[in-house]
Amino acid sequence: MAFDKKLLEIVACPVCKGKLEYDKANQQLICKADRLAYAINEGIPVLLENKATPWNEEA
């Protein structure tokens, strides 16, 4: 199942409530402010702080 990019208009980072960006190659949503990545499983973003992974722009 593909991620619906329209969700980006309504979802926010659960930590800072900031904007998330879609990383299609890695199937995750990125919060650049908190440097966290949230996985997308079967088209559904897992927006739980304890499930986030550190994000590195170079990765």
From Swiss-Prot:
Segments crossing the lipid bilayer: none
A GO cellular component entry from the record: cytosol
Stored Pfam families: Trm112p
Alphabetical list of Gene3D superfamilies matching this protein: 2.20.25.10
InterPro entries reported for this sequence: Trm112-like (IPR005651)
HAMAP family: UPF0434
Family of the protein in this entry: Belongs to the UPF0434 family.
Protein name in the entry: UPF0434 protein Shew_1640
Organism of origin: Shewanella loihica (strain ATCC BAA-1088 / PV-4)
